[in-house]
Amino acid sequence: MLNTLIVGASGYAGAELTAYLNRHPHMNITGLAVSAQSADAGKLLSDLHPQLKGILDLPLQPLVDVAQAAKGIDVVFLATAHEVSHDLAPQFLAAGCVVFDLSGAFRVRDAAFYSQYYGFEHQHPDWLDKAVYGLAEWQSEDIKQAQLIAVPGCYPTASQLALKPLVDGQLLNDAQWPVINAVSGVSGAGRKASMGNSFCEVSLQPYGLFTHRHQPEIVTHLGTPVIFTPHLGNFARGILATITCRLKAGVTAQNIADAYHHAYQNKPLVRLYQQGVPALKAVVGLPFCDIGFSVQGEHLIIVATEDNLLKGAAAQAVQCMNIRFGFPETQSLL
């Protein structure tokens, strides 16, 4: 059994993560923590998330002393704000813990990226170099050796899973950048109340045009430029990405299907549509990314869907943990 501490368990992704780990046969949850200043400190997780009543009636402890909290801990999950993960991860790593960070604090190795897109100066370039990007279907060998796994963002997960087989297979025409239009549910903004996320205010609206931090994350790890436009949708959870591309001359629909099949035939958490494209309702509450496409001449449209809290966060973190420790990849997820 691996002793596990979850920091930031009070949030949406943190609660989903805790539920997955609670039913994992090789994980022992030794504590749930929140920041010392959190208004949730001292409350039961099940008081904040009533669906967990009778399942996870565990207290949320204020994290005051990291060295003390790390004693006897094998694995730490950080479902915390970017700046918080930036500060906490090196301390847990120094204590010998394996850390899975769901924030963006270690996803990109260029330290200048963080001051530009996250608003803080990165102080741990050594861990930026050592961190492994946890796109589970593509980084499994590196994940097996890593001490710090940076779990990808929600939009980058769907976007890269949809595009990477085609980019790596050199099937796309470089003269036209892939265009990613993606819509996310409101849970992607977290539990903290705000006017823009309130029931009567939420509509369907693009945001972060040319400035969203997930665009350079996608470009860095995909290895090709893209145009990315996120949208906030008036639903609770899920992401649907519609991606338009231009194919190289002579590339057929069968070539696209073959590339996806080759990439994901042994990847149980990516589901490929032989016909048609996926709908959001088929993935909400499940750990999958579903992918479908349509071709007309040299034009390709891909649709990828996922639950932003699961494959876009908690489920992928557990998937990475399973890979890291040699457990079945879907353990506790299916």
Swiss-Prot record:
UniProt KW Amino-acid biosynthesis keyword: yes
Active-site residues (renumbered): 154
InterPro entries referenced in this protein's UniProt entry, alphabetically: AGPR_AS, AGPR_type-1, NAD(P)-bd_dom_sf, NAGSA_dehydrogenase, Semialdehyde_DH_NAD-bd
EC number(s) per entry: 1.2.1.38
Superkingdom, natural source: Bacteria
Cellular compartment(s): Cytoplasm
Enzyme superclass (EC): oxidoreductase
Reaction catalysed by this enzyme: N-acetyl-L-glutamate 5-semialdehyde + phosphate + NADP(+) = N-acetyl-L-glutamyl 5-phosphate + NADPH + H(+)
A molecular-function term among this protein's GO annotations: N-acetyl-gamma-glutamyl-phosphate reductase activity
GO cellular component: cytoplasm
GO BP, one annotated term: L-arginine biosynthetic process
Keyword Transmembrane helix in annotation: no
Role this protein plays: Catalyzes the NADPH-dependent reduction of N-acetyl-5-glutamyl phosphate to yield N-acetyl-L-glutamate 5-semialdehyde.
Family named by the database record: Belongs to the NAGSA dehydrogenase family. Type 1 subfamily.
Protein name: N-acetyl-gamma-glutamyl-phosphate reductase
Taxonomic placement: Bacteria, Pseudomonadati, Pseudomonadota, Gammaproteobacteria, Enterobacterales
